[in-house]
Amino acid sequence: VAETTIKPFNLSVAKNIIGPLAQTNHFLVTFSSLTPSVENYLADYTGIKSIRSFLSRNVGILCNEAVIPTSTLATAEVKDNFMGVPQQFAHTRFYTDFSYTFYCDEDYTLLRIFEGWMEYITSGANDDVEQNHRAYYRRMRYPDSYKCNTMYINKFEKNYKRTLRYKFVNAFPKSIDPVPVSYGSADILKITVSFNYDRYIVNG
């Protein structure tokens, strides 16, 4: 009879072998600035004059939840290299969107910033027709004018021995989730924003 390699073990043994496991509640989101075009538009659209200062100081504190993105590979199948053995080869790498959930301050600053950012992206026709006009239409801005390269998420542990830093290249807000409000017991208002980007770079 062949000797089995399966042996019982408990959590203390596993912890000694594997070591401490990563925790979900140690992270920091940083977001320092937008493009000058977006910042200037937001200053007029929202009346917020210190957007860069607000983002650099407050985003990390107000971010309640974040999603670390991943990627997938699109493949093509080849059947002719080896008889009866299909093979797949990668041809494109796709990156999943990432999202941040923020606490909303009583001035609704972040909600106004992200709404204004998306408004800027779609406001290319504003010089042609007023928004209140029945013939108003949307024209998209050039990507270089609204995509930014200052969004990061840092994943670390409480001992700070190891940090993973994700940099998002050419990020912009793709959607804002509906924000529910209701009568009853009060709760903190939160907004969740999903972002698209070209790719991410991981350092760590």
Regions found by a protein language model. Give the residues of each.
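Glycine-rich, low-complexity intrinsically disordered segments
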Residues: 1-204
